[in-house]
Amino acid sequence: MRHRHGLRKLNRTSEHRLAMLRNMANSLIQSEAIKTTVPKAKELRRVVEPLITLAKEPTLANRRLAFDRTRDRDVVAKLFNDLGPRYKARPGGYTRILKMGFRVGDNAPMAFVELVDRPEPAAQAPAEATE
């Protein structure tokens, strides 16, 4: 019986699923926003949120745990130097999933996953038309 098994398999082997979620988490932490399918986005939330919670307390043990889960030093540095202090006062809910229609090829439901309270990119002034 399949009672209380909450993990989505995403039609992949366990190694493939783990590697895919690790890569997606690294991409989300680096760029702070990615586009993916809705089921992947919902699973990604379960990976990224505990990482940011770890980064809120910058101990050596937490850095080692984060590196063990991400396997990327740049991602760990951004987590502990940038995201941990940013979300220090927030008690969870660091990601936002926005549904954005369906993919053209296979009609898969797509979503935009972003970190909340991320700094907006600086808007460039419109170029003046020279005559």
UniProtKB/Swiss-Prot annotation:
GO MF annotation list: structural constituent of ribosome
Query: Gene3D superfamilies per the record?
Result: Ribosomal protein L17
One term under GO cellular component: cytosolic large ribosomal subunit
One GO biological process this protein is involved in is: translation
Q: Which PROSITE patterns match?
A: RIBOSOMAL_L17
Q: Which InterPro entries does the entry link to?
A: Ribosomal_bL17, Ribosomal_bL17_CS, Ribosomal_bL17_sf
Q: Which Pfam families match?
A: Ribosomal_L17
Similarity comment: Belongs to the bacterial ribosomal protein bL17 family.
The record describes its quaternary structure and partners as: Part of the 50S ribosomal subunit. Contacts protein L32.
Indicate what this protein is called per its UniProt record.
Large ribosomal subunit protein bL17
Natural source organism: Methylibium petroleiphilum (strain ATCC BAA-1232 / LMG 22953 / PM1)
Q: What is the lineage of its organism?
A: Bacteria, Pseudomonadati, Pseudomonadota, Betaproteobacteria, Burkholderiales
